[in-house]
Amino acid sequence: MGKVAAKMKVMPQSPEVDLDELQDRLENSLPEGAKISRVDREDVAFGLIALFPTVIIPDEAGGTDTVEDAFSGVDGVESVDVDEVGRI
């Protein structure tokens, strides 16, 4: 079975959220078999910075749903969207 790289957009609840701590919480929330290969940061507006983790997951039914659900439940996360997906 192959693997998929999914670049996710994670918006913090406010500019006051510590992004390093948020990144650690995201890594700890990952479902089994998933791992973060890199995390980019991008200024959005008014001091708000979005995290763009690239998550490597098995290519199976459900795709990124389990990662999206896990990230959505993390304290300090306002929203989670899939930015890009590709097989590796």
Curated annotation (Swiss-Prot):
Statement: the UniProt record of this protein carries the keyword Protein biosynthesis: yes
* A molecular-function term among this protein's GO annotations: translation elongation factor activity
Gene3D superfamilies membership = 3.30.70.60
Q: Which InterPro entries match?
A: eEF-1beta-like_sf, EF1B_bsu/dsu_GNE, Transl_elong_EF1B/ribsomal_bS6, Transl_elong_EF1B_B_arc
Top-rank taxon of the source lineage equals Archaea
Transmembrane segments annotated in the record for this chain: none
Record bears the keyword Protein biosynthesis: yes
Keywords from the UniProt entry? Elongation factor, Protein biosynthesis
Q: Which HAMAP family match?
A: EF1_beta
Q: What family does this belong to?
A: Belongs to the EF-1-beta/EF-1-delta family.
Protein function: Promotes the exchange of GDP for GTP in EF-1-alpha/GDP, thus allowing the regeneration of EF-1-alpha/GTP that could then be used to form the ternary complex EF-1-alpha/GTP/AAtRNA.
Q: Give the protein name, as stated in the record.
A: Elongation factor 1-beta
